[in-house]
């Protein structure tokens, strides 16, 4: 089974992957997954909203957009001490990567010193760090890299062809430019998309082509299933067929064999069997123990129970010789009930 990295995928061959008989597609994806990863390990991340709501963008799916009529209350930038406290709880619970998200079009220069301090403080705990702050200039990317940021998340959201139906305040090229700035600064890229936005099947193929043809490919690829939020233009859109979502995970694994494919937003709408199929298809990363702003993420004990049923262990930070299986004993109830955690579909 060929798992060589490629950056020249075309629509015809990707549509052919999506059209494979389901069992054949799953077998191909799982075989490639086993060539590159331990099939029974999942990387665990935690997300924290460091600044919530009042975003000026017009993303039609998002509760944080000031243009959408949701009940979300805006909040100011969190103090560094609060961020560090949440990161410590996440580490105790078993997360190896701490992701910090702000509802900004782009960070202002006045915000950068606080953001950089957050990165340095979380890094001092021995965790990997990730941020998603909107568009970045080259200089801002350099500053974040200098502070020690490991990953920067900036999703493409959907295909170039469907993009203007979802967002008009930021271009698709703007997103690619930010990813380029992140790469040039020396950081790892976290970039994926959202399915269930009313796109056609061809749009899912096109989105994955855009991601896989990035050179290098993103180290982390979050695949979100739309979380419908009352007050947004997509609140009443038809649900995505479960098998279409699982196929998207499998094709992403085949096209990006060395990337972590994250089963991201939308897991509360998935039963255990669907999540297990996603892991079989090659998903090997989740957001763990979080509460999303717009919908509950599965509670920590539910994830623990599912991992135990499937015989899944959690991945450790590189260089850590001990398993993080003790998350069963150290899960913290306050984190599940906290209102700080960030909407992974944003």
UniProtKB/Swiss-Prot annotation:
Q: What is its EC number?
A: 2.8.1.6
**Disulfide bridge positions per record:** none
The record lists [2Fe-2S] cluster as bound by 99, 130, 190, 262
Pfam families, alphabetized: BATS (PF06968), Radical_SAM (PF04055)
Q: Which reaction does it catalyse?
A: (4R,5S)-dethiobiotin + (sulfur carrier)-SH + 2 reduced [2Fe-2S]-[ferredoxin] + 2 S-adenosyl-L-methionine = (sulfur carrier)-H + biotin + 2 5'-deoxyadenosine + 2 L-methionine + 2 oxidized [2Fe-2S]-[ferredoxin]
Asked if the record carries the keyword Iron, the reply is: yes
- The segment(s) forming the Radical SAM core domain are 40-264
> Pathway, per UniProt?
Cofactor biosynthesis; biotin biosynthesis; biotin from 7,8-diaminononanoate: step 2/2
UniProt GO BP: biotin biosynthetic process
Q: Which SMART domains match?
A: BATS, Elp3
Write out the residues that bind [4Fe-4S] cluster. 55, 59, 62
How many cofactors are bound and how? Binds 1 [4Fe-4S] cluster. The cluster is coordinated with 3 cysteines and an exchangeable S-adenosyl-L-methionine. Binds 1 [2Fe-2S] cluster. The cluster is coordinated with 3 cysteines and 1 arginine.
One MF term in GO for this entry? 2 iron, 2 sulfur cluster binding
Name the UniProt key words of this record, in alphabetical order. Answer: 2Fe-2S, 4Fe-4S, Biotin biosynthesis, Iron, Iron-sulfur, Metal-binding, S-adenosyl-L-methionine, Transferase
**Cofactor section:** [4Fe-4S] cluster; [2Fe-2S] cluster
What family classification does the UniProt entry report for this protein? Belongs to the radical SAM superfamily. Biotin synthase family.
Instruction: Note the subunit structure.
Output: Homodimer.
Relate the protein's function as given in its record: Catalyzes the conversion of dethiobiotin (DTB) to biotin by the insertion of a sulfur atom into dethiobiotin via a radical-based mechanism.
What is the protein named?
Answer: Biotin synthase
The protein's organism comes out as: Colwellia psychrerythraea (strain 34H / ATCC BAA-681)
């Amino acid at each position: 089974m060929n798992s060589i990295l490629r950056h020249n995928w075309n629509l015809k061959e990707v549509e052919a992957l999506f059209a494979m008989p389901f069992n054949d597609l799953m077998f191909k994806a799982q075989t490639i997954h086993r060539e590159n990863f331990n099939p029974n390990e999942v990387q665990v991340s935690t997300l924290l909203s460091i600044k919530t709501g009042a975003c000026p963008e017009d993303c039609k799916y998002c509760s944080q957009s000031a243009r959408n009529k949701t009940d979300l209350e805006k909040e100011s930038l969190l103090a560094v001490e609060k961020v560090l406290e949440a990161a410590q709880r996440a580490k105790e619970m078993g997360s190896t990567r701490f992701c910090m998200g702000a509802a900004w079009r782009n960070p202002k220069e006045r915000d950068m010193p606080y953001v950089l301090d957050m990165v340095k403080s979380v890094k001092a705990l021995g965790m990997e760090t990730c941020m998603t702050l909107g568009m970045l200039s080259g200089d801002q990317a350099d500053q974040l890299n200098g502070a020690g940021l490991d990953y920067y998340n900036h999703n493409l959201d959907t295909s170039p062809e469907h993009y203007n139906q979802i967002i008009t305040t930021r271009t698709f090229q703007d997103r690619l430019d930010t990813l380029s700035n992140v790469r040039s600064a020396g950081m790892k890229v976290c970039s994926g998309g959202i399915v269930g936005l009313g796109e056609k099947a061809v749009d899912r193929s096109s989105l994955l082509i855009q991601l896989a043809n990035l050179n290098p490919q993103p180290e982390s690829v979050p695949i979100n299933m739309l979380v419908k939020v009352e007050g947004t233009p997509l609140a009443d859109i038809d649900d995505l067929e479960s098998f279409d979502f699982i196929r998207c995970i499998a094709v992403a694994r085949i096209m990006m064999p060395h990337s972590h494919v994250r089963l991201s937003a939308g897991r509360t709408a998935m039963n255990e069997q669907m999540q297990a199929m996603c892991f079989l298809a090659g998903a090997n990363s989740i957001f763990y123990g979080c509460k999303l702003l717009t919908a509950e993420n599965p509670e920590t004990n539910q994830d623990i129970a599912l991992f135990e049923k499937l015989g899944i262990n959690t991945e450790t930070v590189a260089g850590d010789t001990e398993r993080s299986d003790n998350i069963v004993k150290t899960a913290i109830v306050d984190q599940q009930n906290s209102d700080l955690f960030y909407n992974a579909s944003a």
